[in-house]
């Protein structure tokens, strides 16, 4: 812990030019670019309309309703999420509820088709 405190003190005493040189050295050593991260972070703030046009990359698969085949839907929810029988049943009966969050578009479409085949009504958000 004392080493970290010393490191913080050393970094705090750097001039702006020394800090910029340090950033460049770390970028080279780690093979990353801090400039790209800054550009990405600044992008949405600059143009809200451009962000709206961008295609969504992460989706939440939401179970809107179980439909008539509730048992089949519970089985599919268990297979997808790894939940136990009671937890999957509670999720299905408590619809609308998210089944899986932060999934890629192709996986979300696959899960939607799988659950709809079992009889569920699914929304992608």
From Swiss-Prot:
GO cellular component labels: cytosolic large ribosomal subunit
GO molecular function: mRNA binding; structural constituent of ribosome
Gene: rplL
Annotated PANTHER family: 39S RIBOSOMAL PROTEIN L12, LARGE RIBOSOMAL SUBUNIT PROTEIN BL12M
CDD domains on file: Ribosomal_L7_L12
Lineage per the UniProt record: Bacteria, Pseudomonadati, Pseudomonadota, Alphaproteobacteria, Hyphomicrobiales
Function of the protein: Forms part of the ribosomal stalk which helps the ribosome interact with GTP-bound translation factors. Is thus essential for accurate translation.
Oligomer and partners: Homodimer. Part of the ribosomal stalk of the 50S ribosomal subunit. Forms a multimeric L10(L12)X complex, where L10 forms an elongated spine to which 2 to 4 L12 dimers bind in a sequential fashion. Binds GTP-bound translation factors.
Pfam families xref list: Ribosomal_L12, Ribosomal_L12_N
Family note: Belongs to the bacterial ribosomal protein bL12 family.
Name of the protein this chain belongs to: Large ribosomal subunit protein bL12
Coiled coil residues, start to end: none
The keyword Ribosomal protein belongs to this UniProt entry's keyword annotation: yes
Superkingdom as given in the UniProt entry: Bacteria
Organism (species): Methylobacterium radiotolerans (strain ATCC 27329 / DSM 1819 / JCM 2831 / NBRC 15690 / NCIMB 10815 / 0-1)
Keywords: Ribonucleoprotein, Ribosomal protein
GO biological process terms held by the UniProt record: translation
């Amino acid at each position: 812990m004392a080493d970290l405190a010393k490191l913080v003190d050393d970094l705090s005493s750097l001039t702006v030019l020394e800090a910029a040189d340090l950033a460049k050295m770390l970028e080279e050593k780690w093979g990353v670019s801090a400039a790209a991260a800054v550009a990405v972070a600044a992008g949405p703030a600059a143009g809200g309309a451009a962000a709206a046009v961008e295609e969504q990359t992460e989706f939440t698969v939401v179970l809107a309703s179980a439909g008539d085949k509730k048992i089949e839907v519970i089985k599919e929810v268990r297979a997808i999420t790894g939940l136990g029988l009671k937890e999957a049943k509670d999720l299905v009966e408590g619809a609308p509820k998210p089944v899986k969050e932060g999934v890629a578009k192709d996986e979300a479409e696959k899960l939607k088709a799988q659950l709809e085949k079992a009889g569920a009504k699914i929304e992608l958000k």
